[in-house]
Amino acid sequence: MLELPIISITIFLPLISVLYILLFFNQNKKADKLSIYVAMLSSVLTFISTIYILIEFDVSNNTYQFVERYTWLDKIGLEFHVGVDGIAIFFVVLTSFLTLICIIGSLFTIKKYIKEYLVCFLLMESLCIGAFTSINLLLFYLFFEAILVPMYIIIGVWGGDNRIYAALKFFLYTFFGSVFFLLALIYIYSKIHSFDLTNILELIGNIPLFAQKILWWAIFIAFAIKTPMIPFHTWLPDAHVQAPTTGSVILAGILLKLGGYGFLRVLLPLFPNASQEFAIYVIYLSVIAIIYASLVALAQKDIKQMIAYSSIAHMGYVTIGIFSFTEIGISGAIFQMLSHGIISSSLFLIVGTLYERLHTKEIAKYGGVANKMPILATFFMIAMLSSIGLPSTSGFIGEFLSLLGIYKVNVVTAFIAALGIILGAVYMLKLYKEVMLGEITNTEIKHFRDLYKYEIISIAPLILLIIYFGLMPNSILNVFHLSVENLLIKF
């Protein structure tokens, strides 16, 4: 294995590209074109580096690999301490993959401030990879919260008519959670004098149990907002509806996963006793989210809003899997996060192609699109069927394992949560029928042409992954199997 600081390279490559674009390219069309070349090269190289990490990853080792540790601010315990384990590695790959997809997808759809748009995406890629690889809790916090800035700008500048409201709502919700998280970190450091996760795991017992419960709730709120869980969910539909297409892809595909990842990386291992005590409340909230969000999705008239509420429901399966404290449930939750990242990204890209042609997201304005766009209709069908959990697609594996995990803990809860699959089938099949099938009622649809090459290049890899994950789930599950076992040692 090459002795390269591969994690640092992966984190800082997009950041260096951001600095290069900002420092050397002026605001003109030529600069936009050069920025595209730099962003494409950067995202390709970053993706290659994450694939290298995945190939060289030793699945028989349940500890962190490719570890790097450098002192940053020793007086406050801040170190650049990064590495990957079986849980983190796929989120790192997913981040680089979706960023590349988004940059390709935005080449022909973003018309203003192209250079700045690409800068925001590269910056977000760097910050997300940093968050997924951090082993220092303060470093994780800095990456976790800094992601707010580029996403806020993407929604606020390139979003729809109500973009300012949606961006501000997103900012305030996330900032609200970050305050609790920061206060919890300060208290932990005052007692343990370290932000290193491995040190905190060893010394967390020095903190009184009552204080641990308060810390648990403080950190839980931050991750629940990001997931998002009910009642912290209302920012998501507005953000999705107003965000540009590729902004929605990053939001659903990566940012929502930071909440679930935070539960696995921080909340459960640091506070196992409090997690077990409060798990039942999280499970109840998750089941409510699944049923409530599914019913609300059924009533939506906006395509993106429907998919946004479906995301809340799907992330409900993630949280019930995590807080089942079973190996199969947590494995299902991780798989569900990866699967949802791919499915939701493909759905938002598909909606984006429709919006580029008709400039509306209103379901009633469509109908009969499959007559003019058979390739898109096929992609949409596969993504839709996976979203409702059809066997042999990726959506089935994650939901089934999560439900199986909670079934071992609470049978009634499992059956109620399973109703969400039925409701999901109802609203997704209804959406497909009203948009794709039937006669063409809108004369503008008669002039539609099927997917352009760049659209196929953006969507097709996601569709292939949906099928691959569904047919070969063990190739994914086996990678994080030992890490999940290691996580459950304290339970």
From Swiss-Prot:
Gene: nuoM
Keyword annotations: Cell membrane, Membrane, NAD, Quinone, Translocase, Transmembrane, Transmembrane helix
GO terms assigned for molecular function: NADH dehydrogenase (ubiquinone) activity; ubiquinone binding
EC number: 7.1.1.-
GO cellular component, one term: plasma membrane
Major location (coarse): membrane
The organism's place on the tree of life at top rank: Bacteria
UniProt subcellular location: Cell membrane
Residues that span the membrane, as ranges: 5-25, 35-55, 87-107, 116-136, 137-157, 170-190, 203-223, 249-269, 278-298, 315-335, 336-356, 373-393, 409-429, 456-476
Record-given protein name: NADH-quinone oxidoreductase subunit M
